[in-house]
Every structure is written in C-alpha cells, then in structure tokens.
Amino acid sequence: MRVLIAEHDYHVYTQLLRKAAPDLEVFSTGDSAELSRMASDCPVWLGQPDLMANLLRQGHTPQWLQSTWAGITPLLADSLSRDYRLTRAVGIFGQVMAEFVLTYMLGHEREVLARLMSQVERKWDNRTG
C-alpha cells in the first residue's frame, strides 16, 4: 500500500512509519509540486489538514485521509471534495493541552508579560504576588 505523508516534519513521520510498517511504500517530500505529483498515486494520506487541503484543491482525492491534527477545519471548505474517509488525531493531546492551559493561566494570574515589559522598560513594578 502506498502512503503519502504531507507534513512539515515529514522526515520524522516517514522514518517512524517505515520502521513500524516496512511493507508500506511511504512517499514524502518538502516540495509542494513533488507532493502534488505523488498524491495521485497514493490512496492513503497522513498529514496536516492545511497541506492536504491544497492537494484536494488541485483535484487529488485519497481513499483515506488521516489528519495529524485534532482539528480538521482546513478540510471543511465548501470547494473541497469530501469523497474519502477522514480520521483525525484524538486522545493524544489531552495532557499537553492541559499543561498549556495551566501554564497560560498561571502566567496570566501572575501578570508575567506585564512584568516582562516593566523589566524591558527598566521600570520598577510594585505589583503584589
């Protein structure tokens, strides 16, 4: 089976997929024109929705499209074909998102950016906390 990887970090995904499933034919590149040429020969696509949306706009359609993002918004444009199976990354970003939100909330509560600006401007900051 031929698998196209449309991802900015395509080399990492290619290496991991070839190691996990050596019987697959994996196609990947950082060049968008070459990616477009490869797309028509690959029934399975793995990658970023924004990059795969460009391939769909060019008239290519996979049998199965696996998003590496949880969100699929770029693939929902009215002009794009939806004649394929679409799956997305789910259940793997929970802890990372929780850490991001907690860090952001702490930074907001402690006014980290305002304190940084005061330091850059060499102003004494009398904020409590």
Predicted regions and their residues:
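An N-terminal-biased, well-structured beta-alpha scaffold segment characteristic
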Residues: 1-86
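Phosphate-binding beta-alpha-beta segment of Rossmann-like dinucleotide-binding domains, i.e.
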Residues: 82-129
